[in-house]
Amino acid sequence: MLTIRDTAIALALFVAATPALAGSMVKVVESGEAGEPMTLTMDQTTVPAGDTTFMVHNDATTEEHEMVLVKLKSPDQTLTVVKAKHRVDEKTLKSLGEVADLKPGADGQLKAKLVPGTYMLFCNIKGHYEAGMHATLTVTK
């Protein structure tokens, strides 16, 4: 016969082991090689506020990629690209973290606590943002 204590322990273990109760998960795939189109895609573009884990996969065969996460001031905000460097000027942004230096075929993850608003995910390796490696994520209440 289960005691109240045993039931409480079992419930606590179940809750701790259930990923769905731990927040949202967004799967991100980065792909593209030099001279070809480059993409950053997500399996969902809207998540509720709270803890979010980004599972990032570099699907390229020869190119290294990264993923930077920033909160935009408004949904229509554009990021400033330093033309001479072919990179987004990260000094003007508040990064919430990044998955850096993903080798071809590699995986990485980023955990962040998100508040409602619009976010951008992008690769800031030289020329990759300009080649299309960016996507927006909407976080709801």
Write out the residue ranges for each language-model feature:
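Bacterial N-terminal signal peptides that target proteins for export
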Residues: M1-A10
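N-terminal signal peptide c-region/cleavage motif recognized by signal peptidases
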Residues: A17-T18
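N-terminal edge beta-strand
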Residues: G23-D51
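Active-site/binding-pocket entry motifs
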Residues: A34, T62, K73-P75
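Beta-strand cores of secreted/periplasmic/IMS beta-sandwich domains, seen most often
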Residues: D43-L69, G108-M120
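Extracellular/periplasmic metallocenter environments
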Residues: T61-T62, A100-K141
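Short edge-strand/loop segments of extracellular domains
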Residues: K71-Q77, V139-K141
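Extracytoplasmic beta-sandwich strand-turn segments characteristic of Greek-key/jelly-roll folds
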Residues: S74-L114
